[in-house]
Amino acid sequence: MSQPTPIITTKSAAKPKPKIFNLFRVCFISLLLIAAVEYFKYGTRINYEWFHCTPIKEPQSGSVIKLWARGGPSCDKRGEYKTIVKRITRDYEPNDEHLSFCIIENDNVPPVHYPIHEDKGEPGYVAYVGYDTDSELVQELCADSTIYHM
């Protein structure tokens, strides 16, 4: 009978290299990317008005406020409108009480305007917002514009 052939294993003379340095390199690159994102967020927070529209509120009477938005170059009429609507939906709770508001467009301001100076000029939109307990005042302030109810 024939004998089974023996299994021959050869050991490599070179030892496997430790992977710890690769781990440190990957961790360092990851931390560097996180730091870059956080630095960008910090830089834009300081110059927030330059990138976004800031809502400005002026109380009228009761729950009624006059609301408009100002900002830097990216705050054109579209940005002002979005900021006003976002502020209305976040600040007022229609489940507590119904809400009345109107948004009045200023036709003197062009749709795309870049207010880069300290004097931002007139706002493109102005809104009057209030709960229905003050609906008479909202109707008076809105005059001929459409009044929305939520």
Swiss-Prot record:
Disulfide bonds join C53-C75, C102-C142. GO terms for cellular component: acyl-CoA ceramide synthase complex; endoplasmic reticulum; endoplasmic reticulum membrane; nuclear envelope. The keyword Endoplasmic reticulum applies. Residues 1-20 are cytoplasmic. Changing C102A: About 90% loss in enzymatic activity of the LAC1-LIP1 complex. It comes from the Eukaryota. It is found in: Endoplasmic reticulum membrane. Keywords: Disulfide bond, Endoplasmic reticulum, Lipid biosynthesis, Lipid metabolism, Membrane, Signal-anchor, Transmembrane, Transmembrane helix. Changing F40R: Abolishes the enzymatic activity of the LAC1-LIP1 complex in vitro and leads to the accumulation of phytosphingosine in vivo. Changing C75A: About 90% loss in enzymatic activity of the LAC1-LIP1 complex. Residues 41-150 are lumenal. The chain crosses the membrane at residues 21-40. Its main location: endoplasmic reticulum. Changing C53A: About 90% loss in enzymatic activity of the LAC1-LIP1 complex. Changing V37Y: Partially impairs LAC1-LIP1 complex formation. Changing Y81A: About 95% loss in enzymatic activity of the LAC1-LIP1 complex. Component of the ceramide synthase complex composed of at least LAC1, LAG1 and LIP1. Forms a heterotetrameric complex, where one unit of the LIP1 homodimer interacts with LAC1 and the other with either LAC1 or LAG1. Belongs to the LIP1 family. This is Ceramide synthase subunit LIP1. It comes from Saccharomyces cerevisiae (strain ATCC 204508 / S288c). The gene is LIP1.
